[in-house]
Every structure is written in C-alpha cells, then in structure tokens.
Amino acid sequence: MSELENFHAISLPSRCLPYDGVKPEDITARSYLGRDEIYLAEITPDNLDQKFLQIMKGAIRGIDPEQMTLGDREYFILWEYIRSYSDHLGFELVCLNCGKQIEIQVDLRELNVIELPENFKQPYSIPLPSGIDVQLRLLTIKDEIDANEFAQKSNEALIFRCARSVVEAGSIVDKMERLKSLPASDVATIRAFHEHFYHGPNMNTKFKCPKCGAEDDIEVPFRFEFIFPRGEALTRAFGKRIRP
C-alpha cells in the first residue's frame, strides 16, 4: 500500500448502530486517488448508486458499503470532497436584506453532523395510525439500488422502498400488497420514520452579507459537484494553483 492509500478513522453519523457486528472504531477510509477519478468522471445522476458503490468498495474499510445507510453515504461523499478536493464551497445568492447578488464561501468543515440517537436500535417498532404496530429499519445503499432498478419497470418505487424497510416475514411482493391496502396515513408514517431518523451532514448554516453586513440562515445545496467537481466548481477549488 502506498503512502497515498493511508486509511484514516471516519466517524459515521449512524454511530454504526444499524449494523450488526460492526464497530465504529473499525471504520476507516482513504481520500480519492487518481484511479478513482476515472470512475468518478463516469458518474451521472442516473448511475450514481451503482458507480459510486464501486468507489466506496475501494475507499472504505470495516463495513460492507452495500449495507451502509443513505445518511452515512451522504456524509462519506462530503468527507471525501473535503479531503480530496476542497474544504470550502463558493456559490452565488441574492441577499434578502439588501437585494444584491453576492458570492459567499462556506467552510464545509464547520457544518454540523446529525447523528442517530444513542438509544437507536433496529428493528424499530412504531404504532401506525390504523392501530397496528410495525417493525422498521433504515434503508441501505443496496435498498436504494434495488429501488431504482425497480423504478425502471414500475411506478410503485415509493411502496417498494417502504416495503424494504418493513422487518417481517414474507416476500417483498407480499409486503407491498399489504402496504397498498393500508390507509395512506400508515404509509406516510413509515415514510416519516426515515425523515425523523435522518442522519448525515446538516447543510443549514449562517452567512454574513459582504454588501450590507446582514446575517441570515442558508441551506447549502448538496450539489452533484460533491461527487466530482468540474467546470466552475473545479476552477474555484484549484484555479488559484495555476499561474498565468
């Protein structure tokens, strides 16, 4: 292993609570290498799940990337961007106080991280509005890949995702049929479970307008450039290193 392939400890926002037999202290990751850029350049919104999984398999150790939660993946994407490309993100917006177009720089290292509560445990039992209890788990990268493949041939991907998170005996088809017969409020509650236990980078931060000095809150957009910077994002990150 070369010096560039040194693996470093990474603290996942899930605290590894959803993973059986996985210890947080055993999770390590490395920054991207040149060979990773070959595959990163091929990633599009349509193939992100499959392509980025291949990158993760070589860049993270101590866990099977397919079994990682979507929140942990989002955190890992930002972790890699900070270590491999830039710890700052610049973008333009309109100040709501003075109405001027401004450019701000956000230090990505200062973003807060939302973690799963220490008492989180899977499967997680919740009562549905109809009165029945259901056991749920968080969705994984493998679930998302399967859901996207399912969406290519069916318009029931939403129900598919919900069914994958239900922990009970029976096939995925049986679970989907059961969910389709439940009240909409029950299905919405299952969806709310995943929103409630979001974990990953908190993209909300504060900024100060350079024109008028007003402070405001902003949600930093989780952009596709976090996967592979190009164009203006690439120039902002590395353009100053190139002498005229």
Q: Where would I find each of the regions flagged by the language model?
A:
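Long C-terminal interaction/binding lobes of large macromolecular proteins
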Residues: M1-P244
